[in-house]
Amino acid sequence: MTALAATSLAAGSSNAVPPSTPCALKRTDAHHSEGLDTWNAAYPRPDRRLDAVMIFLSFPDSVPQTTPTELTADHFPATSRFFERASYGKFTLRPHPLREWLPMPRASTAYAIKRDWNSARRSAYLRDALVASDPRVDFSRYDVVYFVADPDAPGVNSDATKVVNLEAPLRADGTDIRRVVTVFERHPPDRLVLAHETGHVFDLPDLYHRPADDKGDWDTYVGDWDLMGSQFGLAPDLFGWHKWKLGWLDPRQVSCVQAAGGEGTRMTLEPLGAGGAAVAGAAGGAEGAEAVESEFRGRRLGGGSGFPSGGLGSGELGSSELGSGGLGFGLGGGTKLAVVRTGRDSVIAFEARGPVGNDGAVCSQGVLVYRVRSETVSGGGPVEVLDAHPDTAACWEDSVYPPLADAPVGLGESFTVPGEGVRLEVEDRTDSGAWTVTISTG
């Protein structure tokens, strides 16, 4: 660690190099690599407005029981609001839904739709969908394509919802279509499922662990702490590392901790969800301050709040407190992410998580610690949350994985990363709700 830190200091000495650069892992050939030194140009980068077309497909063996308008409302504006909050208003996903069903030429059962889909049947489905929709859609106008199947058709399987990356792009309207989102969700669908799948369109990996028999725990890697782990998570905002990758954090908001030994590096971490659309409201006013599901309203936070007297966490959460996050967390321009380089393809990351923005239903708050590996493929554990309280669990009724629900390091606590010699001390809270910490290495 000492040699690595010294190298990082030398690399960061030039004024032309942002101070976060030494901690930026190199992008590798791993599928959805967590490296972020460069952007993979095969994917659209969500740092601006992107347009998405929603195409609704019916089948000759079923009469739709829902309308395209109803299915659109299943996913929007919730999906757009999630990304506007997560990106601090830097990214807008604008949906363009068709208003009618487009008939497919074959019965829904003919495509053998399932989670691990036969590639030949899947290709046939995509070809048929493109032929059915091309007369009605100018694909050159859109950055994202959603093919939404009739949820009541007998051959439709909700487990098959996924992003399909095409080695040989489909071609329509002079445009190469390199990936599509195939939506087979029920009505109503799983919460935030379209946001999860759309994350793959932006080169984000799956963070869940799929058991060999599909019967064990899927959420052992990151628990509730990122949408790409579970759309059901209590704190589904994207990790700060992902926000850095997607271009939503300015370089000055990422602190690369380079000093080894000594007294460590002291800094203030602002809650990840604070700022931009998270404070102003994704769509402005009450509409932009969409509250999380009512079942979480009034639930007391676990793990100790550590807020200043009278601040959030000193009592119950009301519905007005769970939405956009305009709760005195500050303006949102401070440091969001601290990183320690631990190897050629690995880092330890630190970020403050609390009940603001997309994390309104968080179980416990504090400074979350996690490991990132750039050479680990999607689904293989490229991110692992490190549990500061391995002997306890929390929020058994609501959490997707209670053992990690209380993972953050709380006020007055310290945590040493096993095997790395990296130590975090959470010392204080500011009046605006930020966390004062010291990170030591060596």
Summary of predicted features, one role per range:
Residues 1-16:
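Secretory targeting and sorting signals
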Residues 55-60, 148-152, 204-207, 230-233, ...:
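Active-site-proximal beta-strand/loop segments in catalytic clefts of secreted hydrolases
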Residues 61-66, 235-240, 358-360, 378:
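Short, solvent-exposed loop/turn elements at domain surfaces
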Residues 25-26, 32-36, 167-180, 184, ...:
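Non-catalytic C-terminal accessory/binding modules of secreted extracellular proteins
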Residues 139, 152-306, 310, 323-357:
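Extracellular hydrolytic enzyme modules, especially secreted metalloproteases
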Residues 15-187, 195, 213, 425:
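Zn2+-dependent metallopeptidase catalytic core
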Residues 46, 118-122, 183-190, 220, ...:
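Extracytoplasmic/periplasmic, Sec-exported soluble proteins
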